[in-house]
Amino acid sequence: MSNVNTLSALAKSGALSGKRVFIRADLNVPFDDAGRISEDTRIRASVPGIRLALDAGAAVMVTSHLGRPKEGALTEADSLAPVAQRLSELLGMQVRLVPDWVDGVSVEPGEVVLLENCRGNVGEKKDDEGLSRKMAALCDVYVNDAFGTAHRAEATTHGIARFAPVACAGPLLEAELDALGRALHDPKRPLVAIVGGSKVSTKLSILQSLADKVDQLVVGGGIANTFMLAAGLPIGKSLAEPEQVEQARAVIEIMKRRGAEVPIPTDVVCAKSFGADAAATVKAAADVAEDDMILDIGPQTAQRLADILKTAGTIVWNGPVGVFEFDQFAHGTEVVARAIADSAGFSIAGGGDTLAAIAKYGIADQTGYISTGGGAFLEFLEGKALPAVAVLQARAA
């Protein structure tokens, strides 16, 4: 999968000594009301790539987007200043913040500077060629270490990579591409995918793409309700998309023709209303009443999925199978999560809700790989080319 140049290979070969290295990281972190960083995972994840370049004797420039500022009109709230401070603490050295950096940056070997929010530059979002060429002129080596933005063709993720003398993947991006390639391009069978979420329409292209590849396609959440409708089961007043039933049937049909399966729930957990205090009732799937809402899979279905997952060679997990935020509707997602943790197969998980479930059940160490990309992870599952990766592949060819 990763037929790209890598920062680790360049560092090992001694090619970075005295060179100017430009790293596009993903430092788009959340802030609390007082303007303090509330969660710094992405900043910590960027440190190995920065250290690698510093230890190899490079002069290092790092940039990232933060939020969605107006190009050419950054405000104080859009500034990477708090990120520079946190990065200084993590690296144990001063990290200067450089504003207005497109026309030139002074940085010495062994030093690292943070270039102010790249989305402040006019032309960033449009992947402007003039801006891309100017940024490429700042460096000897361009590094993309931001998988989370790999599905976007912007000046710092795509354009600069076309014109920099050398363009490569940082360690974070390299690990992500290796894990995704292992899961989808050369998977150990059986390959099981779990796709949860509220709407078939938003995940339809993923479901269609996976229907050609996987041995078991487990659907969860509102998506499962639409598949239950397609299988002729009652769903009461559950969240579903009746207009997507034909598409759901087509996915089931593709799987069936390949000797593969979409396991439809045989029992479910229902409530009369949606909320933290709603009373939960387990019912056979055929017995759902008109005023019922399906909010989780039942214990029998959960056990069946656990058995499938325990014997899987590869697992791709995107989305919970129930409303796991409420404990009475969390059993299905917990059983699935623990089965993934116990499976001997290679697992890759991605998407915000999935990461929240992994954190809730404390299984991060037992998950093969946790993807840092939301939209990029989904587009990869769809089989789409990611512009930021495609340009690195083209430069390595």
UniProtKB/Swiss-Prot annotation:
Pathway: Carbohydrate degradation; glycolysis; pyruvate from D-glyceraldehyde 3-phosphate: step 2/5. One of its GO terms (biological process) is glycolytic process. It is found in: Cytoplasm. The keyword Cytoplasm applies. It is an enzyme of class 2 (transferase). ATP binds at K203, E325, G351, G352, D353, T354. Substrate binds at D26, L27, N28, R42, H65, L66, G67, R68, R119, R152. GO terms for cellular component: cytosol. Its main location: cytoplasm. The keyword Mitochondrion does not apply. Its EC number is 2.7.2.3. Keywords: ATP-binding, Cytoplasm, Glycolysis, Kinase, Nucleotide-binding, Transferase. It comes from the Bacteria. GO terms for molecular function: ADP binding; ATP binding; phosphoglycerate kinase activity. Signal peptide: none annotated. It catalyses: (2R)-3-phosphoglycerate + ATP = (2R)-3-phospho-glyceroyl phosphate + ADP. Belongs to the phosphoglycerate kinase family. Monomer. This is Phosphoglycerate kinase.
